Amino acid sequence: MLGRHECTISESVSALDPTAQEPEYTLVPSTSRDLVRDMTLNMEDAQAHLKEHGWVKIPAVLSKAEAEDALSRLWEAKAASEARGECTFQPILDPNPANVRVFYLPELDAYWRDMLVNPTALDLAKSLLGDQLLVSNFSANIARPGAESMALHSDQSIVLPAPWLDVWAVNVIWCLTRMTKENGATLYIPGSNKWTTWEDVPDNAPDLLVPFEADAGDIVVIDGRLWHTSGSNVTEDEDRAILFAYYSAPHMRPLTNWSAKLPKELQETLSPQLKELLALSHIGYVVKGDLTYMAQKYPSEKGTTAVSA
């Protein structure tokens, strides 16, 4: 696994183009002599773009060789999951079995657990959710030729009632193969992270979808309020394999109950960081406000005597 990503900014859409809804914003490998300074500055820019537009793409977080290794491990995870009786076709999500789903990846291989704490991905998720975020789910979707699109949705609209005013979920999409419009790339609606109610979704929403196109090894980080769907794989012989590392705010119940799903023997081997991320610590970090606010607003005075009603 790679560590923190060294990068600079590349915007291929001119700010002077009046038809551009938002920049095609990605980060490319740095050529700066001061890599540490350059990395810090541009990760801040990436976080700012994620906050404003609801997504950001970071290339080459995995090398091509690492992406190929991860893809091989994913097919092994599919076989292991099916051997345990887990269904890899979910009719509630996908129109046909050409869309393969593999759930509960942290249970299947330490490789996936390491991916959850990748510094680049985790820092971007924390930039929206804060330091005490949780892993709500970690799964895979392989769109094989013939796979069709699922329903349009935002991640938060599925689990939370409107209005969606705050970011309470972040999905990190790990591309193990290239992701193109033809092979079923995730489709999204630019600017939809600003929608706060069902009424904000326009009647022509499907016509507004554009693809996230990426190379094997890239990640795409999306705000839980960004409306998106899977694309259809219209190729004859090309799989599109991606992972979804789904992080949530600490006061939200995770989609997966890891304390019940992960064997106790496995839980005991996890690092303190992973135990907290998987909500296996005995402490729940659910405080969002400031516990000292009212004490500061109404400071007690020494010598004051309580008055009974």
Curated annotation (Swiss-Prot):
Its cofactor is Fe cation. It comes from Aspergillus fumigatus (strain ATCC MYA-4609 / CBS 101355 / FGSC A1100 / Af293) (Neosartorya fumigata). SUPFAM superfamilies: Clavaminate synthase-like. This is Dioxygenase af480. It holds the Pfam family PhyH. Induction: Expression is controlled by the fumagillin biosynthesis cluster regulator fumR. Expression is also under the control of the developmental and secondary metabolism regulator veA. Expression is significantly up-regulated during infection. InterPro entries: Phytyl_CoA_dOase-like. Dioxygenase; part of the gene cluster that mediates the biosynthesis of fumagillin, a meroterpenoid that has numerous biological activities including irreversible inhibition of human type 2 methionine aminopeptidase (METAP2). The pathway begins with the conversion of farnesyl pyrophosphate (FPP) to beta-trans-bergamotene by the membrane-bound beta-trans-bergamotene synthase af520. It catalyses: 5-dehydro-6-demethoxyfumagillol + 2-oxoglutarate + O2 = 5-dehydro-6-demethoxy-6-hydroxyfumagillol + succinate + CO2.
